[in-house]
C-alpha cells in the first residue's frame, strides 16, 4: 500500500471522503501548518489528515462558537502534541481522512479561514510531534479491497452495495421526514442524491445525527456494503425513536458546521 507523511489535524469530528470541512484556525501550531500548506501551488493538492480524537482534548477550545470561545491568535501557543499525552497516536482513532484545502485565507489577525474537502481514507501508522505541528505517516485504505483481490468477488460486492444503497436512500428519506417533521414534497428527491453506493454511504454517514464514535465506526467500515448495511440498521432504529419525539429542526445536507481551531 502507498504510504505518505502528511500534516495531522485532530478534531472532535469525523470527516468523510467527498464532504466539505470549513475550519477557523486560531492556534499557532495549526496556523503554522496552514502557512506551509498555503505555499503549495494552488493547482497542486494541499493535503492534510483529519483524524477524530479518541482521548485528550481537541486541538482548540471549541465552546459555543461565539467570539470569546476561541483564543486570540498567538495567545495559545501550545506544543504540537500538547493535550494528547506522551504518545499522541494513542489519543486518536487510527482511521482518518485526507483533506484537500481548496481555500486557505489568512485574516488580518493571523488566523486562517480554511475550506477543505475529504478525499480518501487512510490508516495512521505513526505520529510525529517533533516539528512545529503534528505529522503522521499514513497508508491508503481501499474502499473496496475485495475488488482489488478478486474480480468476481469484487463484482459481487459492488452488486450487493448497489442494492443496499437503494434501501439506505429510502430509509434516509424516511429518517429525514421524521427528523424534520416535513411533508413528502419537501424532502430531497432521488434526483438530488448520488447513485454511487460509496458516495451514498459517506453522505448518509455525514448527514445523520450520530455521535462521533458511531460516525467513526462508519468511516472505518471495511467496505461500502458493510457501511451501508450498518447505516440501514441505524436509520431504521433512529427513525423508530424519532417517532416518539417532538419535531426537530430539519437537517441541511449542503452546510457543515465550522470547526474553530
What are these regions (language model features)?
Residues 1-261:
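N-terminal low-complexity, acidic/polar interaction/targeting segments
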Amino acid at each position: 500500500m502507498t504510504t505518505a507523511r502528511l500534516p495531522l489535524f485532530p478534531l472532535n469530528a469525523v470527516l468523510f471522503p467527498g464532504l466539505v470541512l470549513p475550519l477557523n484556525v486560531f492556534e499557532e501550531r495549526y496556523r503554522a501548518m496552514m502557512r506551509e500548506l498555503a505555499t503549495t501551488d494552488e493547482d497542486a493538492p494541499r493535503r492534510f489528515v483529519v483524524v477524530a480524537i479518541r482521548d485528550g482534548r481537541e486541538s482548540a477550545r471549541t465552546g459555543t462558537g461565539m467570539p470569546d470561545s476561541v483564543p486570540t491568535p498567538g495567545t495559545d501557543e501550545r506544543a504540537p502534541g500538547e493535550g494528547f499525552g506522551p504518545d499522541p497516536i494513542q489519543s486518536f482513532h487510527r482511521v482518518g481522512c485526507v483533506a484537500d484545502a481548496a481555500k486557505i485565507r489568512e485574516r488580518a489577525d493571523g488566523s486562517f479561514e480554511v475550506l477543505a474537502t475529504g478525499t480518501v481514507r487512510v490508516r495512521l501508522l505513526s505520529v510525529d510531534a517533533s516539528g512545529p505541528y503534528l505529522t503522521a505517516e499514513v497508508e491508503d485504505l481501499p474502499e473496496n479491497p475485495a475488488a482489488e483481490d478478486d474480480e468476481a468477488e469484487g463484482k459481487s460486492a459492488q452488486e450487493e452495495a448497489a442494492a443496499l444503497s437503494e434501501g439506505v436512500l429510502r430509509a434516509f428519506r424516511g429518517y429525514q421526514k421524521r427528523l424534520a417533521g416535513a411533508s413528502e414534497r419537501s424532502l430531497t428527491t432521488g434526483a438530488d442524491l448520488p447513485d454511487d453506493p460509496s458516495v451514498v454511504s459517506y453522505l448518509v454517514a455525514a448527514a445523520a445525527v450520530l455521535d462521533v464514535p458511531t460516525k467513526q465506526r462508519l468511516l472505518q467500515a471495511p467496505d461500502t456494503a458493510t457501511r451501508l448495511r450498518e447505516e440501514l440498521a441505524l436509520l431504521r432504529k433512529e427513525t423508530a425513536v424519532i417517532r416518539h419525539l417532538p419535531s426537530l429542526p430539519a437537517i441541511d445536507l449542503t452546510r457543515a458546521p465550522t470547526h474553530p481551531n
